[in-house]
Each structure stands twice: as structure tokens, then as C-alpha cells.
């Protein structure tokens, strides 16, 4: 499970150092792809495979599924962190997420999200106002 928020920097070669606490789960391989709200999703290879299987068995007659799958898979890039825990984010994915230097890497349960620092701050400020109200809608009776 991925938890917490970290603030690594993207280097000039487009590499990002993963937080130490995330490395063990990602060291066997990972997949980076487009996420919602212009962030990137990073999945351990096993989790990406599970998602792929779910999408593979879904009916291709559903246009929304075809559209989502095309974007999700065509933007995906597999990688293995180097010995320093760095991954290379391909230029098209960096452009999509607006990643230049300052980044935020968030644990999001079964995935990691990579955000441009300013975009994350804006998103978080927008969500803070409704966060307290969301729990009852999203998790009724759980929290």
C-alpha cells in the first residue's frame, strides 16, 4: 500500500527519485501512464497486469471503455527503477502532467501519483473545502 506525500525533483534527464518507502514494491517493475486531473499514475507491474486483465475481459462494445483503454494503454511506459530508485518519465508524459522540476509524489493506496507541485497545491486547495463533506458520500458509515 502506498501512503504519504513526498517532494522529489525531476532532474535534467527527466528522472525522478522515488521515495525510499515506495521502492521495494516497485523494484520488480512498474508502469507509468496518464492519470486523471493531469497527474501520472505509477502502478507496480502486478497491479497494472490486474487492471489490464479487468479491461481485457470487459465488453469492447462500450465506447467509453474503448476510449479510456486507448488513452490509458497508448500512454503507458514500463520501467524498472535504477539502483538509486530513479525512474525516467518519458517526455510525452512529462508534458501531459506539466512536470518541469518541482514534483509531488503521493501514495494513493494501490498506485503512486506524480503531480506538478503547483498543480497539486491548486488541486488540494480546491478539495480541502469539500473534503469533510465527501467522506459521508464516498464512505458512508466507514469513517
UniProtKB/Swiss-Prot annotation:
Keywords: Cytoplasm, DNA-binding, Repeat, Transcription, Transcription regulation. It is found in: Cytoplasm, Nucleoid. InterPro entries: MraZ, MraZ_C, MraZ_dom, MraZ_N, MraZ_sf, SpoVT-AbrB_dom, SpoVT-AbrB_sf. One of its GO terms (cellular component) is nucleoid. Residues 5-47, 76-119 form the SpoVT-AbrB domain. PROSITE patterns: SPOVT_ABRB (PS51740). GO terms for molecular function: DNA-binding transcription factor activity; transcription cis-regulatory region binding. Pfam families: MraZ (PF02381). One of its GO terms (biological process) is negative regulation of DNA-templated transcription initiation. Belongs to the MraZ family. Forms oligomers. This is Transcriptional regulator MraZ. It comes from Parafrankia sp. (strain EAN1pec).
